[in-house]
Amino acid sequence: MRGRRFFYSRFLVSKDINLWDMKRYWLFKSDVEDYPLSQFIKDKKTAWEGVRNYQARNFMMKDMQVGDEGIFYHSNAQPSAAVATLEVSALATPDKLQFEKKSDYYDEKATQEKPRWYCVNVCYLQSLKVPISLEAIRSEKDLQSMQLLQKGNRLSILPLTEKEYKKLLKLGGL
């Protein structure tokens, strides 16, 4: 008898696979002016706050686990580029900025009892030896299906396949 199947992000997975035991990989985008790599290195660990897209929020709430790894990517930089690696260090908790009236990320519909926005903690692992520009990513045949390259994709957090993650590490000199 055939097992039921379901879609997890972009991946077809059998019901017999325990997704919680699988390490996942992510691309975390940050505007270079909002949170530069130099600040991430100094902080060593940060709450990934300010995500205001439901799909990206759901990745953090439902899919990310402690130990998942990712690429820190500077958007709106000259050039935009993958610059470091990181690791998810704590599960999703309510994003405190949604409750702060003076914050750019304040959400008047969010309450302590029913928060709308969540964030995970991530810790800095290491800088790539060679930043990987968006142009370099586009030119790699093995990375053509990356969600980062899909037209209209503006999410601040994107899933990566293990193959994409390892290719980015290689391109970055790690």
Predicted feature residues:
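Short, charged beta-turn/beta-strand-edge "cap" motif at the junction between a beta-strand
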Residues: 73-79
